[in-house]
Amino acid sequence: MVELLHSIKAHNDKAWSVSVHPTLPIIATASTDKSTKLYKLSTKQKFPLVAELEDTHKRSIRSVAFKPPLGGVDAPKLDFLDLPALAAGSFDSTISVWGIDEPDVEYDIDEVVANQKEILTSPNNEWNLMAIIEGHENEVKAVDWNFQGQYLASCSRDKTVWIWETDPETLEEFECVAVLNDHSQDVKNVSWHPSMNILASSSYDDTIRIYQQDIAGDEWSCVGILNGHEGTVWCSKFESFKSPTADSSILRLVSASDDLSVRIWVAKREEEEDKPELPSSIKHTKEMVWEVESVLPAVHKYPVYSVAWSSLTGKIASAGSDGKIVVYSEAEKGKWVIDSVHEGSHGVHEINCVIWAQLDDENEILVSAGDDGYVNLWNV
């Protein structure tokens, strides 16, 4: 059962995207109104506004993404303050990077680290613009950080995927280390694997592309093409190895499309040693062969814009143009069933994004963003 927990009137225009910080109870939103807003996921505090980031982009902000903690979510706890940071991609073709400055005053580091969920989500923190990244020729459609915060991926209507490298501790400079031109049309979404340096991109050309570095760590290239959708692929997300349904020997990915379907793909690897005829430029890259494992039960009547895969339960949520939020669970390997369907989740408006999140009490919820400018929080 999907039940409304809370509704936030976040924006005066379309809410495009929501990002959840991997370790802090905080979300960021993106909107046509050119602003990004941050809210704390606290029922006791009634989901307060933490920060409003504006007056930077000239056009719609299409995507936001929080940088993961240093070393990744599963890294040992740090004995210093790991300050949160956020990237925002805009239709003005640029990406902004925001962060909190470390306090100038002296403080007890042990106390701050122990209470960072409260301290780092306080509305008293000042979020500052740290960088503006330029390179794309047209609208930036999506941004996403890799699991260690070293790489930021972006995609655009210019048909390209860019990978930017930075020092995750300082975020002082962003160097473009790859421009990937494999798609023939507008690229709608990019998404990193939760614990591997593998990137997926989804496109108006009806395909999903998978990218990885060569073994030497020098070049990024396309190592897999997922064909099967009969319309624009709006979104794709990898399954986390933390998921109770995950198999660590394979990779799985869920995708959402204009063709009304939600699909699960599974990867099988081929070693390049078996392909001596390949050019030397990709000789040391592992090719991934992907197959459709299953097509989830048909529910949506209009294009599906967003999917999310829970690392806690293994459940998948989808949402899109028909205003439905659908939750699926895996009854047995490769066999999915519908858990619940919620109609009119944003009234008569389309849903642009759905994502799993944890409240400050660690209960898992769904968060959706719609054309009505609302961000809705759902108990599942």
From Swiss-Prot:
<keyword id="KW-0853">WD repeat</keyword>
<feature type="repeat" description="WD 3">
    <location>
        <begin position="135"/>
        <end position="175"/>
    </location>
</feature>
<keyword id="KW-0963">Cytoplasm</keyword>
<comment type="subunit">
    <text>Interacts with NAR1.</text>
</comment>
<dbReference type="GO" id="GO:0016226">
    <property type="term" value="P:iron-sulfur cluster assembly"/>
</dbReference>
<feature type="repeat" description="WD 4">
    <location>
        <begin position="182"/>
        <end position="221"/>
    </location>
</feature>
<dbReference type="InterPro" id="IPR015943">
    <property type="entry name" value="WD40/YVTN_repeat-like_dom_sf"/>
</dbReference>
<keyword id="KW-0539">Nucleus</keyword>
<dbReference type="InterPro" id="IPR020472">
    <property type="entry name" value="G-protein_beta_WD-40_rep"/>
</dbReference>
<dbReference type="GO" id="GO:0005634">
    <property type="term" value="C:nucleus"/>
</dbReference>
<feature type="repeat" description="WD 5">
    <location>
        <begin position="228"/>
        <end position="275"/>
    </location>
</feature>
<feature type="repeat" description="WD 6">
    <location>
        <begin position="299"/>
        <end position="338"/>
    </location>
</feature>
<keyword id="KW-0677">Repeat</keyword>
<feature type="repeat" description="WD 2">
    <location>
        <begin position="56"/>
        <end position="108"/>
    </location>
</feature>
<dbReference type="InterPro" id="IPR036322">
    <property type="entry name" value="WD40_repeat_dom_sf"/>
</dbReference>
<comment type="function">
    <text>Essential component of the cytosolic iron-sulfur (Fe/S) protein assembly machinery. Required for the maturation of extramitochondrial Fe/S proteins.</text>
</comment>
<feature type="repeat" description="WD 1">
    <location>
        <begin position="10"/>
        <end position="49"/>
    </location>
</feature>
<dbReference type="InterPro" id="IPR019775">
    <property type="entry name" value="WD40_repeat_CS"/>
</dbReference>
<feature type="repeat" description="WD 7">
    <location>
        <begin position="346"/>
        <end position="380"/>
    </location>
</feature>
<dbReference type="InterPro" id="IPR028608">
    <property type="entry name" value="CIAO1/Cia1"/>
</dbReference>
<protein>
    <recommendedName>
        <fullName>Probable cytosolic iron-sulfur protein assembly protein 1</fullName>
    </recommendedName>
</protein>
<dbReference type="GO" id="GO:0097361">
    <property type="term" value="C:cytosolic [4Fe-4S] assembly targeting complex"/>
</dbReference>
<dbReference type="InterPro" id="IPR001680">
    <property type="entry name" value="WD40_rpt"/>
</dbReference>
<comment type="similarity">
    <text>Belongs to the WD repeat CIA1 family.</text>
</comment>
<dbReference type="Pfam" id="PF00400">
    <property type="entry name" value="WD40"/>
</dbReference>
